Amino acid sequence: MSSPVNSDSSPVNPSQRALILVVERNPAVQRLERFFLEQAGYSVEFASDGVSALERARELCPKIVVTEILVPRLDGLSLCRALKSDPRTRSIVVLVFSHLHAEDRALEAGADAFIVKPIDEENLIDIVSKLLEIRKEGAGG
């Protein structure tokens, strides 16, 4: 079983945790997402809108950006296009989610994956883990 969840016998050093930038404006949802993703062994940072997410992505170089399509100031699809067109951020994996069935539009914008909401904790962690594994394999291991 290749779960990203840590066992007591193999703790993850915080400096070795993959950094995930989540675009989420609701503080209650941020707390839940932080809890679930940190329990799974990831470091988590948040941006409350697309413009600040783009700035934070350039500053932090996270492994993954997780964004909804409908976010303020710069929608998730425009954020994805901006990330994928910038040499500093084009290698960042982008996971887009929405209530809208917009997978084609998300993939055309450069998203690496798309999820229809609602997203449950296990599904989110599983997809993040798989995307990181694919990215690692693509980078030569």
Language model features with spans:
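Active-site beta3 strand of CheY-like receiver
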Residues: 60-66, 71
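Non-catalytic signal-transmission and effector/linker regions of two-component phosphorelay proteins
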Residues: 1-21, 25, 122-141
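Two-component/phosphorelay signaling modules centered on CheY-like receiver
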Residues: 27-45
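The feature encodes the CheY-like receiver
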Residues: 71-72, 117
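Acidic catalytic/metal-coordinating carboxylates
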Residues: 49-52, 75-78
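Alpha4 helix (beta4-alpha4-beta5 surface) of REC/receiver domains from two-component response regulators
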Residues: 30, 34, 78, 99-116, ...
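Hydrophobic/aromatic residues positioned on beta-strands within the core alpha/beta folds
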Residues: 94-97
